[in-house]
Amino acid sequence: MPSLSLSKLLRVGEGRMVKRLKHIADHVSSLSPEVEDLTDEQLRAKTEEFRARYRDGETLDELLPEAFAVAREASWRVIDQRHFHVQIMGGAALHFGNIAEMKTGEGKTLTCVLPAYLNAIAGDGVHVVTVNDYLAKRDSEWMGRVHRFLGLDTSVILSGMSPAERRAAYAADITYGTNNEFGFDYLRDNMTHSLDDLVQRGHNFAVVDEVDSILIDEARTPLIISGPADASSKWYAEFARIAPLLKRDVHYEVDIRKRTIGVHEAGVELVEDQLGIDNLYEAANSPLVSYLNNAIKAKELYTKDKDYIVRDGEVIIVDEFTGRVLVGRRYNEGMHQAIEAKEKVEIKAENQTLATITLQNYFRLYDKLSGMTGTAETEAAELHQIYNLGVIPIPTNRPMVRVDNGDLIYKTEEAKFHAVVDDVVERHEKGQPVLIGTTSVERSEYLSKQFTKRGVAHNVLNAKFHEQEAQIIAEAGRSGAVTVATNMAGRGTDVVLGGNPDIIADIALRKQGLDPVHTPDDYEAAWDDVLDQVKAEVKADADKVREAGGLYVLGTERHESRRIDNQLRGRSGRQGDPGESRFYLSLGDELMRRFNGAALESIMTRLNLPDDVPIEAKMVSKAIKSAQTQVEQQNFEIRKNVLKYDEVMNQQRTVIYNERRQILEGKDMEGQVEKMITDVVTAYVDGATAEGYVEDWDLEQLWTALKTLYPIGVDYKELVGDGDDETKDITAEELRETLLKDAHDAYARREAEIDGVAGEGSMRELERRVLLSVLDRKWREHLYEMDYLKEGIGLRAMAQRDPLVEYQREGFDMFGGMLEGLKEESVGFLFNLQVEAAAPQAAQAPGVSVTAASAAATASAAPAPAAPRPLPTQEAAQQAQGTAAPSALRAKGLDDGEPRGLTYSGPAEDGNAQLSRRGAAESDDSADAGTRRQRREAARSQSKGKKAPRTKRKR
């Protein structure tokens, strides 16, 4: 019996699911006549009817046909778009928690309206995840028109929003945003010191657009929030001076394929001579090695106008695959500082990790997850294994007739671009629209200059001009249009032959000062007339374009991922339109240089072909496909590795975040503190009495340690004798019981003292604040230690040990040690903090926990969310009713301020680069100087003393 691959095995039963989806779509279509007869008010009233039926026990599955029919009709009335049969199938697949595989141009954005509307009825919030802010804002405004017509609230999460704006956005029925923004909000919620600062209200249902890009490509790079660590080092500038003196293949070697460098002995000698040191690799100089490596990487592997641009004295990363500038984002591990030194701009400080999570583990938080993409079949096994998601192929609405031509390979880049310009000019003259995909800003500008020389009118869409991208894309399908795009993948806008009427109409209305969010009534009133006018204008042009052969997509280079190439091709031939595509390649392309470029060059040399004569051979196409497969496999291994290591952290993170949320929500921590006292005193006693005989116990040292912890009221000499008499017979158990009783009695006296100073119940408030402060600090230290552990764990392989197993074992031990340290420091703080009654304040200072009563007052003043699932502040208010409110108290020396000057690091749209985004500008003078190793040793050597403290449209 032939064996089945895992991918094929996972697709068994797909046919049954597709048949089920067809039956559902038929049922929805059968309800259309009934829904069409409803007035706008009756259609809108259906939402409340569905909510009432849901509260009365009907399930969302039972409501699906009617809800889909209502949303479908609303789409037609509001935006003049009616869901096709296959889009209803896709919407149902999403509702059931699957990935709907829908080809480019099949209307994934419109499809998402159906499951988003249905699941919003439950009132627990729906998150629609896109790849960038532009698409999130566009989709929330565009599809939000339909949802608002039906009485639902929609909102969007954008970078740069304040916590109050984010909280309001999450309170909406449907929230749009990027994967990075959703993930960072989750991490920030677990760093806040006040319930009022929480923004998210749970993880109910998410629809991920371009799911393969977000859950596969970008999953290689974890989300990281960092804070200032090292002060800017003089060594960045020093090594930026030395790097140009070093010669490639003489002083160092570069592996472009693996993106690594290696310094030769000659290079080490030159550096030692420049720095005036004897040995670069001796212990005192070891930190300099990383500065050297980064300086060479900045020189060889990071190219200006390809990987980054310099604007206003700042190095800004360019997403190589999408061509977008990622303003404010930064490379980690000192790489960004090395590039800043190379470009002679201001060098900003390094950071250390404060909170982190992988996209895999973030999206696993959702009760139900689904996604849409045009290319998920090849990753079916990974999607099932990691996210438990099935991939359902949705048929196309019309058959695809695009012609995909074979690749043309030229010997040099110059010859390739000359041929590209000739091809484009020829097609432009006959009126065929052309879309050219490039891989960098530099190449798009080079082509632009060539077209200008030849007198070809064209538009450029790249990292420097993507603000105008909607208008450029809307006009890219007009006859004779030539559009140069850094990369089309993820742009999310269809190129419609003759022009995109919806986008053109939207732009026209915005020029009149109308907006679907701020002036919805005027916008909707003007929409129909403007849209009809635009449609009439583009129809005649669309017929001309079809006669000329449809949209011609021309790729100037192959990308690492076949999926990116397919997405570029997929811009042509949408909805059964004619179209054509071809890739122009050269032996100088990066992919060719990384894989078998030399072999291909020798073949072309033997053929003795002129530079301007291309070859079109299956062998070359196979070599390219093989190279892409190798890169995809490498990236898959990286993703698996990232996930394996994060699994260790995920269990620890879950424990810490659950504990933290309980403290924030005002849970009575008295029992937990009493247990901490028991555990800490027991550990002290067990450590001192491990020898077994009273004569061997160092009770003086034990008492000295206990005195730093709490005011001990027992003299050890009374227990075991004063030295002159014979030692009294006492067991370790008896000693432990005596000291435990003494410690708990001391805590009772401490509680009475605190309540006397700041009012009844103040001890509970102090417990919460101390535990929160210590928990946060110990968790940050633990993340720092885990980072350090992971940096060097790979070396264990040299000792024939599995690095992952070693990381798991040592990580577990370190987490246990962190928890013990947390208990000890918390107990010390609670006994020794100097507490006084604080003067009444109109508002709580940031980062200071509020009392139960003030939490209730604040929560009751907060706007109620639109959906039944309450915000955390409201839950706390409900729990706090009837609780006695202590006076405000102030604890001297307690660090309960939140971290400042944060940096946010996450994946770019292609998932390739580790990037960071500087948070809101905040002063922070607490960054310690020194290398990571020095900071680590300093932290470890701290003394114990410091630890203690509308109308219906015509059809």
From Swiss-Prot:
Residues 874-888 have a biased composition (Low complexity). It is found in: Cell membrane; Cytoplasm. Residues 861-955 are annotated as: Disordered. The keyword Protein transport applies. It catalyses: ATP + H2O + cellular proteinSide 1 = ADP + phosphate + cellular proteinSide 2. Keywords: ATP-binding, Cell membrane, Cytoplasm, Membrane, Nucleotide-binding, Protein transport, Translocase, Translocation, Transport. One of its GO terms (cellular component) is cell envelope Sec protein transport complex. GO terms for molecular function: ATP binding; protein-exporting ATPase activity. Pfam families: P-loop_SecA, SecA_DEAD, SecA_PP_bind, SecA_SW. One of its GO terms (biological process) is intracellular protein transmembrane transport. ATP binds at Q87, G105, E106, G107, K108, T109, D494. Its main location: membrane. It is an enzyme of class 7 (translocase). It is a peripheral membrane protein. Residues 943-955 have a biased composition (Basic residues). Its EC number is 7.4.2.8. Belongs to the SecA family. Monomer and homodimer. Part of the essential Sec protein translocation apparatus which comprises SecA, SecYEG and auxiliary proteins SecDF. Other proteins may also be involved. Part of the Sec protein translocase complex. Interacts with the SecYEG preprotein conducting channel. Has a central role in coupling the hydrolysis of ATP to the transfer of proteins into and across the cell membrane, serving as an ATP-driven molecular motor driving the stepwise translocation of polypeptide chains across the membrane. This is Protein translocase subunit SecA. It comes from Rhodococcus opacus (strain B4).
